[in-house]
């Protein structure tokens, strides 16, 4: 009887050892996989373009968006159209000085938009699209749109209002560009996984509004690199959540707090100077001068390392390098050689631009990863 129990105990012990071996083998495998994964944390103020960067990674490296996902985006795109026309027509009377409609008979259409389209349960009847198209062509509405830095308007307003005739169609399917442009508030933390040339990346997108930033600390552990995204076109705009704070100044303050954060002193930052297309439009229009918001711009000279695209406006080049240097001033002032800032000019809705920029960044990220695990 005792011998039988002993044999059984030996078998149980053997099974436990085999199970432990399997667990240890899996843990070692998981550890290698974990150490072989580049963790990228996307940070930046609200509406800087972080979520659009994530969408581009899906387009470039995760087979894009399925037909079902495209269908699911229709409601968000319709909401963008509604928010855009509601906001612009609503601002006409509150702007100082106010803006008048070109055609007074359109007042009834504005009243319809403000009364009906503002309701929570709005079903987008054909008359809504008809009125929206007519109002968008009204020069008074266009004049109010041109002053959109004086109120809060989503960046994609013009893009979608120009395409109402497409969006209203029953068989409408959003294009990749439509999905990239679509604005949805990010709340919480979203992880996107993808591989490039057999290298694994995990990208974490965290909401950028002030009340979302307390969640960032949850993502700081084992981060390979931070991608900080700033909207360069925000130089003449104020925050949605604080009408007293300039958007670009908020972004600079946020960058400074991240750069000097004691938990992040060894993590380098890839700086995406985003919305270069919108910055160029504003600078060339000449209506909102950077020096009116940043007086030091009046004395700024383009640095020797500046390069420009063929045919690029010289004032646009000056503007984008001024903004770059404002960020680099922060990183060099408190740099201790333990982490670095790598700036890139980006347009998040331009897939080819993001492809080129991310390809340029991959070598930097790889070096950061090797340094992180003391392999370099």
UniProtKB/Swiss-Prot annotation:
Segments of this protein annotated with the region G3 motif: 201-210
Keywords assigned by UniProt, alphabetized: GTP-binding, Lipoprotein, Magnesium, Metal-binding, Nucleotide-binding, Palmitate, Transducer
CDD domains: G-alpha
Any one Gene Ontology molecular-function term assigned to this protein's record: GTP binding
Domain of life: Eukaryota
Pfam family, one: G-alpha
Region annotated G1 motif, chain positions: 39-52
GO biological process: one example: sensory perception of chemical stimulus
Region described as G5 motif: spans on this chain: 346-351
Domain G-alpha: 36-376
Region annotation G4 motif: where it falls in the sequence: 270-277
Location of the region described as G2 motif in the Swiss-Prot/TrEMBL record: 178-186
Gene3D superfamilies the UniProt entry points to: GI Alpha 1, domain 2-like (1.10.400.10), P-loop containing nucleotide triphosphate hydrolases (3.40.50.300)
GO CC terms, sorted: cytoplasm; heterotrimeric G-protein complex
Binding-site list for GTP: 44-51, 180-186, 205-209, 274-277, 348
Keyword Metal-binding (UniProt): yes
Lipid positions (N-palmitoyl glycine): 2
Lipid-substituted positions (S-palmitoyl cysteine): 3
Binding site for Mg(2+): 51, 186
Function summary: Guanine nucleotide-binding proteins (G proteins) are involved as modulators or transducers in various transmembrane signaling systems. The G(s) protein is involved in hormonal regulation of adenylate cyclase: it activates the cyclase in response to beta-adrenergic stimuli.
Family statement drawn from the similarity comment of this UniProt entry: Belongs to the G-alpha family. G(s) subfamily.
PANTHER family linked to this entry: G PROTEIN ALPHA S SUBUNIT, GTP-BINDING PROTEIN ALPHA SUBUNIT
Assembly information from the UniProt record: G proteins are composed of 3 units; alpha, beta and gamma. The alpha chain contains the guanine nucleotide binding site.
Protein name: Guanine nucleotide-binding protein G(s) subunit alpha
Organism: Lymnaea stagnalis
């Amino acid at each position: 009887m005792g011998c039988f129990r002993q044999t059984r105990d030996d078998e149980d012990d053997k099974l436990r050892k085999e199970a432990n071996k399997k667990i240890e083998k899996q843990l070692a495998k998981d550890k290698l996989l974990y150490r072989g994964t580049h963790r990228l944390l996307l940070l930046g103020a609200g509406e800087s373009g972080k979520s659009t960067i994530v969408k581009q990674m899906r387009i470039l490296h995760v087979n894009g968006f399925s037909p079902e996902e495209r269908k699911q985006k229709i409601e968000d795109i319709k909401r963008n159209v509604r928010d855009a026309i509601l906001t612009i027509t609503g601002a006409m009377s509150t702007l100082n000085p106010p803006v008048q409609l070109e055609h007074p008979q359109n007042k009834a259409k504005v009243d319809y938009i403000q009364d009906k389209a503002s309701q929570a349960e709005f079903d987008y009847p054909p008359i809504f699209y008809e009125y929206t198209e007519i109002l968008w062509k009204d020069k008074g509405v266009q004049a109010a749109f041109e002053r959109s830095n004086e109120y809060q308007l989503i960046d994609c307003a013009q893009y979608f209002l120009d395409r109402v005739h497409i969006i209203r169609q029953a068989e409408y399917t959003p294009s990749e560009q439509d999905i990239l442009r679509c604005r949805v508030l990010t709340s919480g933390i979203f992880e996107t996984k993808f591989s490039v040339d057999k290298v694994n990346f995990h990208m974490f997108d965290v909401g950028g509004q002030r009340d979302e930033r307390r969640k960032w600390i949850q993502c700081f552990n084992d981060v390979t690199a931070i991608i900080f995204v700033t909207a360069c076109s925000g130089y003449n705009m104020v925050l949605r959540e604080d009408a007293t704070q300039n958007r670009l100044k908020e972004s600079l303050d946020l960058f400074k707090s991240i750069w000097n954060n004691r938990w992040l002193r060894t993590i380098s930052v890839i700086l995406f100077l985003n919305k270069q297309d919108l910055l160029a439009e504003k600078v060339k229009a000449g209506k909102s001068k950077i020096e009116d918001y940043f007086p030091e711009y009046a004395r700024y000279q383009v640095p020797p390392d500046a390069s420009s695209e063929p045919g690029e406006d010289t004032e646009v080049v000056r503007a984008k390098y001024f903004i770059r240097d404002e960020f680099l001033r922060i990183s060099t002032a408190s740099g201790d050689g333990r982490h670095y800032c790598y700036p890139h000019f980006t347009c998040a809705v331009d897939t080819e631009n993001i492809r080129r920029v991310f390809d340029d960044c991959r070598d930097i990220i790889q070096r950061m990863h090797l340094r992180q695990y003391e392999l370099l």
